[in-house]
Amino acid sequence: MAVYTLDLLAQLPEAYQAFGPLIDILPIIPLFFLLLAFVWQASVGFR
């Protein structure tokens, strides 16, 4: 029963199925900000 409930919660509602690939990518966005901070500091010479 618990496994079925967890599986049900892991599925997106039908109205949002089209956004599935986008939701897979969204958690990566904060990593881009981290990389941006290093690129920015490299460009200003790590003041």
UniProtKB/Swiss-Prot annotation:
**How is this protein organized at the quaternary level?**
PSII is composed of 1 copy each of membrane proteins PsbA, PsbB, PsbC, PsbD, PsbE, PsbF, PsbH, PsbI, PsbJ, PsbK, PsbL, PsbM, PsbT, PsbX, PsbY, PsbZ, Psb30/Ycf12, peripheral proteins PsbO, CyanoQ (PsbQ), PsbU, PsbV and a large number of cofactors. It forms dimeric complexes.
UniProt-listed NCBIfam families? PRK02553.1
Q: What family does this chain come from, according to its entry?
A: Belongs to the PsbK family.
Signal peptide positions (record): none
Coiled-coil annotation reads none
A family per Pfam:
PsbK
Q: Name one GO cellular component term.
A: photosystem II reaction center
**Name the record gives this protein:** Photosystem II reaction center protein K
- Biological process terms in GO annotation: photosynthesis
Classify the protein's membrane topology as the record does.
Answer: Single-pass membrane protein
Transmembrane ranges? 19-39
The task this protein performs is described as: One of the components of the core complex of photosystem II (PSII). PSII is a light-driven water:plastoquinone oxidoreductase that uses light energy to abstract electrons from H(2)O, generating O(2) and a proton gradient subsequently used for ATP formation. It consists of a core antenna complex that captures photons, and an electron transfer chain that converts photonic excitation into a charge separation.
